Structures are given as C-alpha cells and as structure tokens.
C-alpha cells in the first residue's frame, strides 16, 4: 500500500498492499481496498465500500455506505456516490462463463452525483456535474449538467453545479442557478455551458 501518513484507515477496514491512497483520505468501517486500486486525495470511503483492483478514484470523491466500485470504473474529482448505488462491469453475466476480458469501462466525470440506490450500467459515460436521481437505472452517454431520473433513466432537464434544477432564466434567456446566480447557456446540440465559472476549476 502506498499511503501518505495523513490517511485515516479504520481498524476494521482491509487495505491491501499495492493500492494507492492520497493524503487526507478516510477509509471507514469494514471497507476493502484491493491491490491495484487508486484513490486520490481528501476522499471519503464510507462503511462497507469495496474498491476493486483497477478502479480509479480521483480527488475529493465521496462514496457513501455499501457501494462497490469495480474494475473498469473511473470516478473523476468531486464525484458523489450515494448510499448503496451500484456499478456493473459486464452486460450479460453468467456464473459458469468467465467474462473478465469483457469488462466495459464506466466513467463518471467531474462533480457528478449518483443518488441513493441508483444503478450505473457498464459502459456509461456521465457528464460533468450531471445528477442521477435516487433509484434510477442509467446507461449510455449523457452531457454535462444533465438531470437523469427513472427506470430506464432519461434526461428531464438540467442541474447547476450547485445541484439545483435549472428553470428560472435571466433577462438574456440564460438559465440561472437560484443559489450561486451562475448563468448557464443552452447550446445547439443539447449541451449546457456555465458562463460564470470554468467547468474544470474548483468553486471559489
């Protein structure tokens, strides 16, 4: 295990030699981090979380209780995984057929949030700051700031970087976050851009 001395690991957690955990990260009760897993700085790994070899977790990620992050899953910086959300890594699993060579990559991009008990089908690519509602089942590719709900999940609107549904507009027709007052421009082709803060920069 390659760790900074500032890492907090609960005595009941199992952290295998050969994983990497960044400074300021906390690994809580009964969690298991396998050799080959990579976890960034200042993350929270909740109770009963499994992080597989080959899983990649960025900085400032929060993973709530009872989540398994499998090989092939990448969580970029600032991602939030709600309690008991689920990742898959093959589309047609069988106990008697090995499909380890068929694992599909799943990417959850910067700042996205996965609601409690949501399921992410392998191969999904969820855009920055998108939000998946509790209990939704989501697959495929979705844009930044998409609000996704239902089974199967569908996009029903947009959310701001602060997590609010965007409905109000300013005088120029841009969507307006009720908390930050950041403005968002709807682009041709079904994408959204924040006009007041770069998407790849931390909030002030």
What residues fall within each predicted segment?
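Short cysteine/histidine-rich zinc-coordinating motifs and their immediately flanking basic loops
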Residues: 171-177, 188-195
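Flexible, glycine/small-residue-enriched loop-and-beta-strand segment within the central core
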Residues: 2-11, 16-21, 26-126, 151, ...
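Cys/His-enriched microdomains
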Residues: 155-158, 173-175
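Short cysteine-rich clusters marking metal-coordination/redox-active sites
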Residues: 160, 177-180
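Short, non-ligating residues that shape and space the ligands of small metal-coordination modules
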Residues: 168-169, 183-187
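Short, intrinsically disordered, charge-biased short linear motifs at domain edges
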Residues: 135, 144-150, 159-169
């Amino acid at each position: 295990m390659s760790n900074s001395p500032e890492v907090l690991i609960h005595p009941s957690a199992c952290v295998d030699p050969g994983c990497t955990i960044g400074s300021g990260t906390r690994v809580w009760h009964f969690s298991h981090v396998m050799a080959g897993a990579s976890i960034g700085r200042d993350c929270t790994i909740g109770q009963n979380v499994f992080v597989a070899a080959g899983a990649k977790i960025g900085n400032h990620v929060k993973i709530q209780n009872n989540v398994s992050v499998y090989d092939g899953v990448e969580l970029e910086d600032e991602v939030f995984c709600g309690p008991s959300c689920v990742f898959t890594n093959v589309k047609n699993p069988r106990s008697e057929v090995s499909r380890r060579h068929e694992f599909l990559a799943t990417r959850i991009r910067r700042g996205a949030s996965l609601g409690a008990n949501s399921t992410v089908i392998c191969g999904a690519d969820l855009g920055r700051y998108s939000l998946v509602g509790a209990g939704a089942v989501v697959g495929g590719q979705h844009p930044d700031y998409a609000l996704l709900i239902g089974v199967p999940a569908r996009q029903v609107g947009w959310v701001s970087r602060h997590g609010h549904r965007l409905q109000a507009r300013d005088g120029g027709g841009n969507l307006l976050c009720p908390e930050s007052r950041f403005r968002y421009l709807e682009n041709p082709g079904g994408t959204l851009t924040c006009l007041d803060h770069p998407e790849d920069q931390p909030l002030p």
